[in-house]
């Protein structure tokens, strides 16, 4: 590819508005069924990957390198949802809020058994018996 083609492809990347457009432009093979089910999740993950690239100081001067980094980010985002589901990643607030909470833990040393009809001894009566 020439530099002009790379620059044009980068300009086209900035005009993409659908997941399929990103996949086609960056020449990433994909299963349309996976994209149909996970479209928003893949795009959200991809946006996060692009933000990481920007924070890491991606080579914005060289369109070819930038497009390669974008392609790698899209592949990672797509593979994240071919290997696991949306509930595993919980990218959106509605899914984060519905995340399973860890069960409260009660150690066995804290469990006491009381027979029906018997009264639970109080601390003062136990101390009294110990003093005798």
Swiss-Prot record:
Query: Keyword annotations for this protein?
Result: Nitrogen fixation
Mind listing the GO biological process terms from this record? nitrogen fixation
Q: Mention any Pfam family matching this sequence.
A: NifW
Q: Where is this region: Disordered?
A: 106-132
Q: Which InterPro entries match?
A: NifW
Name the domain of life: Bacteria
Where is composition skewed (Polar residues) in this entry?
Answer: 109-123
- Which regions span the lipid bilayer? none
The record's function comment reads: May protect the nitrogenase Fe-Mo protein from oxidative damage.
Similarity field: Belongs to the NifW family.
Quaternary state and interactors? Homotrimer; associates with NifD.
| Protein name per Swiss-Prot or TrEMBL | Nitrogenase-stabilizing/protective protein NifW
């Amino acid at each position: 590819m020439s530099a002009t083609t790379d620059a044009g492809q980068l300009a086209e990347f900035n005009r993409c508005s659908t997941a399929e457009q990103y996949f086609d432009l960056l020449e990433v093979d994909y299963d349309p069924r996976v994209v149909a089910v996970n479209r928003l999740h893949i795009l959200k993950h991809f946006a996060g990957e692009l933000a990481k690239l920007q924070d890491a100081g991606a080579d914005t001067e060289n369109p070819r390198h930038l497009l390669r980094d974008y392609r790698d980010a899209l592949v990672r985002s797509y593979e994240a949802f071919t290997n696991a589901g949306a509930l595993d990643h919980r990218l959106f607030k509605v899914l984060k809020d519905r995340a399973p909470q860890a069960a409260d833990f009660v150690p066995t040393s804290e469990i006491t058994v009381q027979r029906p009809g018997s009264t639970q001894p109080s601390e003062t009566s136990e101390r009294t018996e110990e003093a005798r």
